[in-house]
């Protein structure tokens, strides 16, 4: 191999290593990174202050089953209904290690379809009805986040997600087995961001 070819190989190899050694990993590496502690809204801050033990329990429950949490993915959020009524929801956003896609393989619609039919119901089952047994909490915001990698399998690329905002009644009915996941989503607000696009409200179609 000539010196020029050796230099070219070294340069390409170094670039690949550099690309794989940097960039966000999109998940919380500790309980402190997983739990959202600071809120601008006074009521949300009160809910956090009163329910820190629940958030810690959720962190332990998911991570003990090797399910990572998105950064600041455990906490509380507000939700305004179509009738312009503001309510407060428990928030759980997971970033499972088993979900990873290559940018050049498949489409964003295919990724969305697989996650919402295969993975979202699976991880929602980790929740318990008692998690929502909190005064002033009207529902659950549950999100599944996943990376779309461009160069290597561990770093780089961008993030996509699905979040659904579901009233407490329908979460409980799903966990009790009274309705299936698809039926639960009929009474949920579903938000997704794909291909680095803006968050969009969608109505999933199951095939």
Language model segments and positions:
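Bacterial N-terminal signal peptides that target proteins for export
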Residues: 1-9
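C-terminal motif of bacterial Sec signal peptides marking the signal peptidase cleavage site
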Residues: 18-19
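N-terminal targeting/trafficking signals and adjacent low-complexity tails
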Residues: 26-34
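Hydrophobic, Leu/Ile/Phe/Ala-enriched alpha-helical segments that form helix-helix packing faces
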Residues: 51, 55-66, 119-131
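Short edge beta-strands and adjacent turn/loop segments
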Residues: 37, 41, 45-48, 52, ...
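Polybasic, proline/glycine-rich intrinsically disordered low-complexity segments
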Residues: 61, 66-69, 88, 133-207
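Mature extracytoplasmic domains of secretory-pathway proteins
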Residues: 98-151
């Amino acid at each position: 191999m000539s010196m020029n070819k050796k230099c070219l190989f070294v340069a390409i190899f170094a670039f690949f290593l550099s690309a794989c050694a940097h960039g966000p990993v999109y998940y919380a590496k500790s309980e402190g990174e997983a739990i959202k502690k600071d809120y601008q809204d006074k009521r949300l801050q009160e809910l956090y202050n009163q329910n820190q033990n629940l958030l810690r329990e959720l962190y332990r429950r998911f991570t003990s089953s090797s399910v990572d949490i998105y950064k600041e993915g455990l906490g509380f959020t507000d939700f305004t209904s179509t009738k312009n009524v503001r309510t407060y929801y428990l928030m759980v956003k997971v970033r499972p290690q088993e979900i990873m896609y290559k940018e050049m393989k498949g489409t964003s619609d295919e990724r969305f379809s697989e996650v919402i039919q295969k993975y979202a119901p699976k991880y929602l089952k980790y929740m318990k009805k008692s998690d929502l047994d909190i005064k002033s909490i009207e529902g659950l915001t549950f999100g599944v986040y996943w990376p779309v990698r461009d160069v290597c399998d561990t770093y780089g690329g961008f993030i996509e997600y699905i979040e659904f905002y579901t009233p407490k009644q329908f979460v409980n009915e799903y966990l009790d087995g009274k309705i299936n996941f698809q039926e639960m989503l009929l009474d949920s607000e579903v938000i997704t961001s794909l291909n680095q696009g803006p968050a969009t409200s969608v109505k999933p179609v199951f095939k």
